[in-house]
Amino acid sequence: MIDDTLLDAEEKMEKAVSVAKEDFANIRTGRITPAVFSKIVVDYYGAPTPVQQLASFHIPEPRMVIITPYDKSSLASIEKAVRDSDLGVNPSNDGTIIRIVFPELSEQRRRDLVKVARSKAEEARVSIRNVRRHAKDGIDRIVRDGDAGEDEGRRAEKDLDEATHRYVGQVDELLRLKEADLLSV
């Protein structure tokens, strides 16, 4: 019973770390990746569809992306969705592909993105700590109900604390890498 609580807590902590990875991938750095387009949704024949399902992405230069739609009729809707997104870019359409040149990040914009990354990391840490608190309450309840001994409860809390520190450390490492990536010119 205690082992189930610990396993459940570890799964939820792992999920918090993976959400943090996704959030960090969506924060733009000097190099563009297709992940910056992951939140863009296109109105495709009346259905909201992620742009990554409608086109392929080619990155010939660090700040340029070429989007090639699988269906040429979706070209205008993809262009509109990218233009209306919060990326702050103006795509150009030549009839078969969409070419996007991202502007160079200013020092102020880089610092703003570092703040965004730090807030995403803090959200992940809070989520991990909430999972820990919930699991600790579950362990305490199991011990109080007499389904496990106090020694086993203390051992489980120690394991839970170690897992919490491990996952918070992973988030801190992801943040450190993202900050280094953002601040490198």
UniProtKB/Swiss-Prot annotation:
Bridged cysteine pairs (disulfide): none
Compartment(s): Cytoplasm
GO MF annotation list: ribosomal large subunit binding
Positions of transmembrane segments: none
Any single Gene Ontology cellular-component annotation: cytoplasm
Protein biosynthesis among keywords: yes
UniProt keywords, alphabetically: Cytoplasm, Protein biosynthesis
A Gene Ontology biological process term: translational termination
CDD domains attached to this UniProt entry: RRF
Alphabetized Pfam families for the sequence: RRF
Family listed: Belongs to the RRF family.
Role noted for this protein: Responsible for the release of ribosomes from messenger RNA at the termination of protein biosynthesis. May increase the efficiency of translation by recycling ribosomes from one round of translation to another.
Protein's name according to its UniProt entry: Ribosome-recycling factor
Organism: Frankia alni (strain DSM 45986 / CECT 9034 / ACN14a)
Gene encoding the protein: frr
